Amino acid sequence: MMGENSSAYTTLADNQLYNQFSPSRRKADLIASTSATSSPNLRKSPNRGFSSPRAQQKPITIFDQIVSWFHSEIDVRKKLASFVCGAAVALSFIVTVSILKLSIWAPFSSVQDSLTWWLYPTSWPVTLFIWLSSVAWTFLIIHQFCTVTQVPRIPITDTYAWAGAALEFVHRLIFVYTAFTVSESSFFEDFAWIAIAFSVAISSALVIFRSDFHLNFSNVQVNSFKTLIDFAKSLPYGSLAETSGVDAAIAYTAAMALTVFGSPLLWGFSAWWLLINIQFHLVLFGVCFAQQFFAKIFMKIVNQIVMKPMKFPFPPPYTVHSPTPDQIRTLPNVIETDDPLLKMFALHDLRTVAWEDEKRRVDVFSLSQPGKHPRNWKAVSMPCTRMLDELCSRMTVSAARLVGYSWDDHDVENEEVPRDALMMPRKMREMTYRGAGQSRQQKTIAPIRSNNTQTVGFLAKITRNLGLGKTERLVISRFDAQQNAYAAEAVYMLVVDSMGEDRFGVVQKDLKDLITLLCKLIAAIDTYERAKASVADKSDVTYLRLVDASLKSCLQRVVTTFGSHLRSLELADEHIRTIKLVCAEEI
């Protein structure tokens, strides 16, 4: 595993351990400490604290160096995404002005003007201004909201989200104002501009609070002009247009309500003439629809540029005493970092190795020299199995809490969660434990939910959808679900590949433990699903089911590959039953 290079992997704890087992080093430190405390100049006084640069500075580990390098790379990608999105906004500005210049009263001259206006040098400064302002806007939005741990919808109580909505409103208002000025539109007059500005404000809030700013890997990676065309073809234009139309209709309805009810007070009854102005309706809805549609395309572009997969090499089989920065950024080191985005890149790369990269799988199944230890396999498999084991523990605790089992009074070493209590409906469970004595009831029944989600009223549902209500606590978030799915698909696909590629048997030694962990996790998720159904809980389990589907697919592949060879592992009866239920075949 990593850590065989003492010069590169030394931290503060390693120094202390080295001092403990090194007599010469301990003696030198003892002499230095004695002289420091006996010197009058360095003696600590009650009014002055003793400090030294060595004591104040936190040691920089290789993980800090890797994270620092990764953040610099991501910052470059975010800047590139900002420039590309700014160019897309400038292009949409040209299209918007061209459409606004069209007129049914002068069809030929207006068509010629709409197609050639942007070719004149006098129009270039305006387009450049739109591009630069859009670059600044997209850069701030990407840095503030686009994260790998972002929730599907930002809560409406988030103050930073409101600041982002205000920034979006100012940016879009400048866009519309400049487009109307260049096209010499007549909508600056009367109440039309107020209605359009109000619709832009509503649409800007919808862009921030109803858009998903989650960073995720794209299915099609753009590496050439052909892949760019494939990426453009892969975009779900139908669903994007549908969701954009719904959000644009909300902003359009709000602007029309202001025109009907607010215009007599603000402008007079003459503003009602806008209600029969077809061009006004088309422009109003078109402005909102264009804003919503670009917000959807915006995240596609950001994910394509920022979330471009990275390849991390494996360390060589021999020990490198003075590794270069490139030799430090190995996959075993990267996968151990605490940065969420970097870990997601590492797990995605490990999954790519397991599924597609046969050349790099040779490094996974290789042995270190000297010693012949499966260093790479242990380094990449242990973080994944540790992650899956933590998920198994969380699912067990969550299932116990759903049925009212107090985990605080549970002896982990001598007891197990009563399975009959997990499968029993709530009313029958309460009747059973009510007559079993006060002590048993206190030990077993300790519900954590005071309200039933079936009794949620209509108003509470509306506030929850708007983000005002109390959000339901998920057992597993989208980020955790994606991480666990990548970890499972990577490790267990490597197990499948080891059947024909593992020449040294580095995976076969851990095969029983890996299959046992997989069966335990599938059973824990099934137990939670049954407990959730027994208490009529309405919490969202979409992400949990994605993990469950990945786990069952992994188990199916492992059983299909090894078949009858699994009998020699002597698995427990409960794990054999899980395999029969999931794979529907005997082993």
UniProtKB/Swiss-Prot annotation:
Residues 101-121, 183-187, 277-281 are perinuclear space. Residues 32-55 are annotated as: Disordered. Residues 1-79, 143-161, 209-255, 303-587 are cytoplasmic. One of its GO terms (molecular function) is protein-macromolecule adaptor activity. InterPro entries: Nucleoporin_prot_Ndc1/Nup. Its main location: nucleus. Pfam families: Ndc1_Nup (PF09531). One of its GO terms (biological process) is nuclear pore organization. Keywords: Membrane, mRNA transport, Nuclear pore complex, Nucleus, Protein transport, Translocation, Transmembrane, Transmembrane helix, Transport. The chain crosses the membrane at residues 80-100, 122-142, 162-182, 188-208, 256-276, 282-302. It comes from the Eukaryota. It is a multi-pass membrane protein. GO terms for cellular component: nuclear membrane; nuclear pore transmembrane ring. The keyword Hydrolase does not apply. It is found in: Nucleus, Nuclear pore complex; Nucleus membrane. Component of the nuclear pore complex (NPC), which plays a key role in de novo assembly and insertion of NPC in the nuclear envelope. Belongs to the NDC1 family. PANTHER family: NUCLEOPORIN NDC1. This is Nucleoporin ndc-1.
